[in-house]
Amino acid sequence: MKSYRVPLVVSAALLLAVLVPCSIGETQGIQVKESVRFQDLSAFDAGLSGLGINARLYTVQYITTADSGQFGGTIFARNVGNKQLGSHWVPGDPRRYGVNDIFWTTDQVDESSWVPLKDSTAAIDRAMNTWQGVSCSAIPLTNVPDYGFDWGYVQWSLNLGGYPGWLADITHAGWLPAPFFDSIAPPNGSEYILGATFTFIWTEDGTPTDIDRNGNYDVAFREIYYNDAFEWSTEGPAWYDPEVDVETIALHEVGHGLSQAHFGKMFVDASDPEPPYSISHLHFAPRAVMNSVYWDTQRELLSSDVGGHCSIWASWPR
């Protein structure tokens, strides 16, 4: 599915309006927010329960296209009222290999229909290395082979391939067809979700754990999925191109994999008082990789991305 945004021929003033991040003080438009909601996704827990594994789905975070009238989203799969907490890895977690490494792998089975496997894998590798290179932290992000398995517990739960378990802490589980994304955001999530990160947390007697008492639920594993219904590219598409940049979305989703939430405010001009809003009037404050809407190729972390990362990972044991 191609998702065209705006005509190529635009004025210089419009280019400045949409491409230059506005400060909050400069923005005079209407603030729009990502969708944050509870949704019953307990069906994804059935397989884990049947296997005797005390891990349960906690959140699904997704990034959307800019021309969809959607502004990203976070789904909480556990309704704990006003006590929604963050989630993070536990150093040396005995339930997770007992080491400080964060293991990751890239599924080599569910490849993109648009980009050769070697190119999409290389783009994901670069995204992982970008986060690894942030100097304030010393996370040992350790790549492990996929061993030829079709990894993906969530897709297995939906009878779309996959595997009833996991190997790595963070799994890039591949490009999935439209029904996968419609199932997590019915009825038409596949029309606007580009990528999604699923976070599973450890539980004990059905209650989320926080064994290191840091105010975050303990992460068991995370899976990242990409929407094959969109046209993908590794050529660095511009904001007006129909393609979606693999590395940009991977960089964003890995941010979720490393416990970052969406960041930044979004505004539309008051000339669009009601949705759906015109894409040409969307502003970010500030612009960040972790904005909940995809705009164009952004392969470098910006200051807010680095700041968020350092606040989470600077104290990780070296």
Which sequence ranges carry the predicted segments?
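Bacterial N-terminal signal peptides that target proteins for export
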Residues: 1-11
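Disordered inhibitory propeptide/activation segment of secreted metzincin zinc metalloprotease zymogens
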Residues: 22-116, 190-217, 269, 273-281
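Bacterial N-terminal signal peptides
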Residues: 10-21
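A generic structural signal for short coil/turn motifs at secondary-structure boundaries
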Residues: 111-118, 233-237, 297-299
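Metalloprotease/metallohydrolase-associated module, dominated by Zn2+-dependent proteases
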Residues: 28, 220-234, 244, 261-318
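Metzincin-family zinc-dependent endopeptidase catalytic domain
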Residues: 120-251, 257-277
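Ca2+-coordinating acidic residues in Ca2+-binding motifs
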Residues: 22, 253, 305-308
